[in-house]
Amino acid sequence: MANSPQAKKRARQNEKRFAINKARRSRIRTFLRKVEEAIASGDKEAATAALRAAQPELMRGVTRGVYHKNTASRKISRLAARVKALG
């Protein structure tokens, strides 16, 4: 348990940031799930549109510190390859 005032404040800040980051991660995962579902259905147009919507969301997560840049790039790259393979 935090004893000093500074430690108590940091604990409060951590809880607040955890909740914010959790919401951001959830939002990004929703966008990624839409791409996955479009790929699974075999609809290339829907998958392309979903990927276009997911890319800026993922990169926004990088800017906000939710994801590492390489992680987001890897996710986008793999999804793009799968969408391209739908042909």
Curated annotation (Swiss-Prot):
Which is an annotated GO molecular function term of this record? Answer: small ribosomal subunit rRNA binding
Asked if the Swiss-Prot or TrEMBL record annotates the protein with the keyword RNA-binding, the reply is yes
Biological process GO annotation list? Answer: translation
Annotated region Disordered: the residues are 1-22
What is the stated purpose of this protein? Binds directly to 16S ribosomal RNA.
State the name under which the record lists this protein: Small ribosomal subunit protein bS20
InterPro entries, alphabetically?
Ribosomal_bS20, Ribosomal_bS20_sf
A single GO CC term, please?
small ribosomal subunit
Q: Which residues form the signal peptide?
A: none
What protein family does this chain belong to? Belongs to the bacterial ribosomal protein bS20 family.
Q: Which UniProt keywords apply?
A: Ribonucleoprotein, Ribosomal protein, RNA-binding, rRNA-binding
What organism, scientifically named, is this protein from? Answer: Ruegeria sp. (strain TM1040)
